[in-house]
Every structure is written in C-alpha cells, then in structure tokens.
Regions:
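Short, small-residue-biased leader/transition segments that mark boundaries at the very start
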Residues: 1-13
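Positively charged, aromatic-enriched patches within helix-turn-helix-type DNA-binding elements
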Residues: 11-12, 18-80
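Conserved active-site beta-strand element of glycosyltransferases/polysaccharide synthases
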Residues: 82-85
Length: 86
C-alpha cells in the first residue's frame, strides 16, 4: 500500500505537522530520532522541550491514522524516535 501526501484525507494541518510529514517522506523507512526531527523542523536554535516532537506526532497521527492506538504510517521506535511505516 503506497501512499503519498495527496492520498491522505484533507484535514487542516499546521505548517509544523506538514514539515514533519515531509521529513518522513524524504526519509522513507529510516528511523528518525526525536533530536533529528526537532533540529530539522524547529531548527538548531530552538530552545524548547523535546516533548514538542511527541505532541506534534500525536496531532499528526490523529489526522492521518485510521487507528491511533495501532499506527501504520508513523510508527514509534521505542527509546529512539519515529519512522514512516510504509
């Protein structure tokens, strides 16, 4: 099942959520650490908490996953980060 950005339901996404999704699409199958995501999306100068990545991943999953309890697109790599699951 191959999907791209255009096949997802059209639900309003924030620029940050779109940037995260784009990062995953540019790195298919590669596990990205929370730090990788934070640096790529928020920039090196961001001085906030790493938890902001988890919060935005959760919001993105609500919009694209059929079952957020068992995600198929954005999967968790425990103790590391996240991976685009397709």
């Amino acid at each position: 099942d191959h999907r791209d950005l255009h096949s997802f339901p059209t639900r309003r996404s924030s620029d940050l959520e779109f940037a995260i999704l784009q990062l995953f699409m540019q790195n298919p199958g590669r596990a990205l650490s929370r730090e990788d995501i934070l640096t790529s999306v928020w920039g090196r100068d961001y001085d906030g908490e790493l938890k902001i990545v988890d919060v935005n991943i959760r919001r993105l999953r609500i919009k694209i996953e059929d079952n957020t309890a068992n995600p198929t697109y954005i999967t968790t790599v425990w103790g590391y980060g996240y991976k685009w699951g397709l």
